[in-house]
Amino acid sequence: NANVHRGIHMLSQEATALHEAARERVRSFLNARSTAEIVFTRGTTESLNLVAASFSQAFLREGDEVIVTVMEHHSNIVPWQLARERWGFTLRVVPMDDEGRLDLEAYAALLNERTRLVCCCQVSNVLGTVNPVREMARMAHDAGAYFLVDGAQSVPHFPVDVQELDCDFLTFSAHKIYGPTGVGVLYGKEALLEQLPPYQGGGEMIARVTFEHTTFERLPFKFEAGTPDYVGTHGLAAAIDYVEAVGLDRIAVHEEVLTRHAMARMAEIDQMQFYGTVPGKTSVISFNVGQIHPMDLGTLLDRLGFAIRTGHHCAQPLMARCGVEGMARVSFALYNTEDEIDRFMEALQRVVRMF
């Protein structure tokens, strides 16, 4: 077991080479300009907390505004609330319509000279809605604001190019793309990352330390305090190799076929309520059936061999917008089949008949 960036011996050099090769793999995958723009974290949650803490310290003061959307994961809401308590800025929220489509007219009205940053999921983890983040980023930039994309639910399902999006930050997690847990990525434009203070202090993120002063390492290392999960980053690189070998365009088409098939079959059930019906959504279907509690649906489906998610899905403000406490959610990946969906439907119909 040899640490990275710390030893001159062969094992450390080999570990470092694998770790930095993974960084280059991520850079290429996202089409970032430089590996200096790729920061390894513990996941999307830590990436968002890093931006919230460091961006707020560098740029936000009382009277400034940050915009989020009603469909954000708690990880893109709570860190901003915590930062707001310290720095005194205002948090604004973009609403959506009943189909799960962001209200871009309301978004345009929220943008003003006080807006410093807009934070938006590219894909809702609840609704499957694919948000027009490229257009939204352009609108933010026209208003003089930066734009952050939560890519946790998009990066595994279709190609994401940070140059095309022209986003200032993008985050995602390895485990969402068939990699290991506990590893994530923060992409940030180099010039912007240079302006942000470190998120944590410790080993390897420093250039020189005295009791009077500390100078920090160059990018991206000033944001990577302590021993990184260099085994996990190598696993992430392997996962990227895997999805690119399959083909992200092929994955997107396959999952779209599965989603259409599943929604058509599920609509056969009386009192089926879908949440998120915007055309072109990704392979996430959130639903309720009549007055059946989603926890009951999930428990009984589990006994029949089907694993679904139930509850508020780390999106309680979105649940409130939809007028429910929770939902059941079924999702599909590249390895699922239409036959599995048909067998899921048999199980779901059996469960519904119990009530």
Predicted regions: what they are:
Residues 1-355:
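Pyridoxal 5′-phosphate
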